[in-house]
Amino acid sequence: MIQQYNPFKKDAFDILLPDLVGIQLESFSTFLKKGLIEQLRDFSVITDPTNNLELRLLVEQYKLKRPRYNEKKCIRRACTYASQLYIPAQLINKKTGKVQEQDVFLGEMPIMTSRGNFIINGSARVIVNQIVRSPGIYYKREIDPKEGIKTYSASIICNRGAWLRLETDKNGFVWARIGKVRKVSGFILLRAMGLTKSKILNSLRHPEFFQKTIEEGDPYSENDALIDLHSQLYPERPSTLFAARELLKSKFFDPKYYDLGKVGRYKINKKLQLSIPEDIRVLTPQDILTAIDYLINLEFNIGTLDDIDHLKNRRVRSVGELIENQVRVGLSRLERMTYKRMAESHPDALTPASLINPKPLVGVLREFFGSSQLSQFMDQTNPLSEMTHKRRISCLGPGGLSKERAGLAVRDIHPSHYGRICPIETPEGPNAGLIGSLATHARVNPYGFLESPFYPTKNRKVFKKTLPIYLSPDQEDELRVSPGDLLLSSSGKLEGKTVPIRYKQDFSTSRSDQVDYVGISPIQAISIATSLIPFLEHDDANRALMGSNMQRQAVPVIRPERPVVGTGLEAQAALDSGTVIVARHDGIVSLVDSNKIILRSSCGSNQTKVDSVGLNFDYQIDRYHLQKYNRSNQDTCINQRPVVHQGEFIKKGDILADGAATVGGQLTLGKNVLVAYMPWEGYNFEDAILISQRLVYDDIYTSIHIEKYEIEARKTKLGPEKITREVPNLGDYVLRNLDENGIVIPGAWVEAGDILVGKVTPKEDLDQHPEGKLLRAIFSEKARDVRDTSLRVPNGVRGRVVDVRRLKGSELPSGVNMVVHIFISQKRKIQVGDKMAGRHGNKGIISRILPRQDMPYLQDGTPVDMVLNPLGVPSRMNVGQVYECLLGLAGHFLGEEYKLIPFDEMYGKEASRGFVYSKLYEARKKTGYPWLFDIANPGKSQLFDGRTGEPFDQPVTVGRAYMLKLVHLVDDKIHARSTGPYSLVTQQPLGGKAKHGGQRLGEMEVWALEGFGAAYTLQELLTVKSDDMKGRNEAQHAIIKGRPIPKPGTPESFKVLIRELQSLCLDIGIYKIDKTKKGQEIDLMMSM
């Protein structure tokens, strides 16, 4: 019996993590309850041009119908999980007083599943959270590089409408720039808004600075200022007073065209210390006047500049808000269309349903969910990757940054990220720093700002019994905050006179009695994937980043295993990912099989009532259906296994069934294997890995992969394509796996080239003879020629057909009669070329599989499973792997599992090393193996060569490490081609495995051969082996018949070059002298 062991139990952190996918579920719930109603309310009244007809939408009474199919059926039928949206509408004829009421269909709204994702066209998709500049006002300073003069600017950013930029120049003028058009004087803008000169000057703290700007444009009336503003902004248009007023109104004062949003209003009020009501979401003259006053004050060193990378100036747009923005776009199009119909149709012929066309809204939502940069194909490699995808935060996408324009400042870690965005987990490539992950305890407040929880502290006393207080980034700036890995005394007070703190974006130390707040957990600053790395504090950040990312790429193996050394977050990660089944009520398991679990739960009380005869009554039945061998988006296998037994009593919240990568409700991504850090005959050079045959024979790293193949039968100009067994020119053996309809039988074993679905396509009839026409007239279409376009198993694929799905009817796109999906399952054992990794960024490729008798073995005769290169540790500085493997070894012999939360140095210096050594010593005492803890070489042991039985020269570090098999499998990458498709233009082989391409001899390869003067080899590679069409055919025939290979001809790409030069009107030709015809010239371009 393996017991779980927490080394620091008495000081263990009560880490109650929030729901890890709550950010998605809460945001979508808010959208349905508030956001959708708000957007509909803006378009709730539409009036026709004559003002006689009025269409009213009763938005609070909107209805969402139950989706037509459940989630499972939507995936099977390749359709969208969505609800129909209906709104009660009234059409009021003001002339006659007639009112028509009707429920109007507004389109289908995709609905989020209980796991926080959407199902679009049968595939799981995630809407990624976007982090953008918050609406508000931002001040910044610019210094002229030549003269060193400082100028200041203020940008007013809105949700919707034109940006306004106020700026000072080196001559002391104040300017305003609206959108991207030319700038105007700040005084003209204020006068055009109706402010008098005296009001302006009285409101400024330093009116003398603004005097210069006033003198430039004085004397001015309000009307003069309006016309001047219009003429300066749009000199090509005639400037009238009405046009000028309308321009100013539409730019800043009309809620339809300009919206600061509640966040923008809140930020402007806070920065400029105004008290304008939150429901006024347009700019006011007071806003602009106060903004200019603040700008002038900066010239006198009064006020503060803004850091745009601070999280108080960036907000998160979650799924609800992103859909809300799309709904607004769709509704504005729908409003225009409805207005047009009202104007064009007779009032008596109109009904609410005939006026409203749902197409604009449906089209916008389809485009957003199907092709937006923020709507992504869900990463379903394992439960962790699924959950991390839902917690991802991206700077990219519409309204955000682009990776080409993003500088280093945006990508960098900022002090305000602490406890909100993980400083470690981010991609490695061009998106580094632009895509992050939410920290474990972070949450998004109603304004969209990220908050982190802290315990209040007073006079060194930390109030851990109270609920933690969530602080926003701007609140935290003004407080002294200590990290969560400080050791407290038994009375709950901070120990030591000084403690590390963060104050005003600076990391320093402070007296412990001055601390305001303390973090609630040591893992508060990092993401869920990073917090699954044990001994994280001993790893370099770059390697921890790789470890976090590679855990998401781990393939679930057939028999997963809990890590001996974990961090305690595995259970929460598995639970919140939604891959395990949890009991909804207390009850007794009445039936368990591989497909379902039936729970008989008591109603109204925790106990099932029993009558006098002993029969149960007053209970309800809960059915839980298990997912069996379903395909994920990444072709891995989704499978659930029951963990309860019939008759067992279950409490609410207990685990009923495990997922593909969970054991006992805990996340299990890999296997514990015996590793040795030593070189072995050069086979582990440069991160290569040497493994034992045991891992292959015992299916230690065997995984199931399910691939999907589909084929469509379409309508063509020559008639419909047919799915049939009657395929021309094929024998019975080739068709052995097909049923009478021409579709493969589930359970059939198929190899590369086998037919999965027989299909014939009508061929264009070239036979225009009278006999052919007569035959067609007699036998109708039957005599028409068809060609074989069957779906075959691609090269390199073999496996068992596990499922066949036929789709017919109205759900298919137009022009398609039938779609068939075939699912082929493969069992993939570990093999040379597969990629493996630990949790510390220690990755490598398998270079050789040795028989277990040849592997190095321990002093008790156990052969090791894996040999890693010791040089992969010192330079990479990921020493956490050494601690993990040694503690894993001790845990294996002691029968214990360990949950070690990262950052344990608060328990004393070298706490990790002390704990690992103590456990090794304990294992040595229990087993009687002195080599488990050798005081001369702690952590190392004498190993013996399996081939000779001789001991190795030096003691070797041996331990049990948790190693993962990654999704980068050699079977998916290896590719070979003898003959295959060519590009039509250049006649060169296509590229890539997907197109069955070949290798290309690029420029650098040509240079290499030129450098060695290999002229004939080069000529052969550039002609016969590449794109000399005539030459390659002749060469093939010569090889088959055993004749000498003829001389090469002209490459096709050279002919393409000549054609391109001819298209530039250059008269260039290439000719060959024919020696057989008296030296006659032959135009090679004509022989194409």
Swiss-Prot record:
Its main location: plastid. SUPFAM superfamilies: beta and beta-prime subunits of DNA dependent RNA-polymerase (SSF64484). InterPro entries: DNA-dir_RNA_pol_bsu_ext_1_sf, DNA-dir_RNA_pol_bsu_external_1, DNA-dir_RNA_pol_su2, DNA-dir_RNAP_su2_dom, DNA-dir_RNAP_su2_hyb_sf, RNA_pol_bsu_bac, RNA_pol_bsu_CS, RNA_pol_bsu_protrusion. Its EC number is 2.7.7.6. It holds the Pfam family RNA_pol_Rpb2_1. GO terms for molecular function: DNA binding; DNA-directed RNA polymerase activity; ribonucleoside binding. GO terms for biological process: DNA-templated transcription. It comes from the Eukaryota. It catalyses: RNA(n) + a ribonucleoside 5'-triphosphate = RNA(n+1) + diphosphate. The keyword Transferase applies. Keywords: Chloroplast, DNA-directed RNA polymerase, Nucleotidyltransferase, Plastid, Transcription, Transferase. It is found in: Plastid, Chloroplast. The keyword Membrane does not apply. It is an enzyme of class 2 (transferase). GO terms for cellular component: chloroplast; DNA-directed RNA polymerase complex; mitochondrion. In plastids the minimal PEP RNA polymerase catalytic core is composed of four subunits: alpha, beta, beta', and beta''. When a (nuclear-encoded) sigma factor is associated with the core the holoenzyme is formed, which can initiate transcription. DNA-dependent RNA polymerase catalyzes the transcription of DNA into RNA using the four ribonucleoside triphosphates as substrates. HAMAP family: RNApol_bact_RpoB (MF_01321). This is DNA-directed RNA polymerase subunit beta. It comes from Chlorokybus atmophyticus (Soil alga). The gene is rpoB.
